[in-house]
Amino acid sequence: MISDIAAAAAAIGAAAVTAQVNIEANIAGIKDEALIAELSGVAALADGVADRAARVVTAVREEIST
């Protein structure tokens, strides 16, 4: 069902945000600047993933409400 797509997208969004917060928390203890830069870049990707997931959820909700 289409609602399963929304549920999966919401789970993906939550996973992306969780990963981002985890990376940000762990960066505080890292001294290697190159690794910090790499991890910061990866963490920034999570914003895009969470945003896309939210758009999918919104699209599904719009579809089922019409």
Describe these PLM feature segments.
Residues M1-T66:
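A structural signal for small-residue-enriched, beta-sheet-centric alpha/beta enzyme cores
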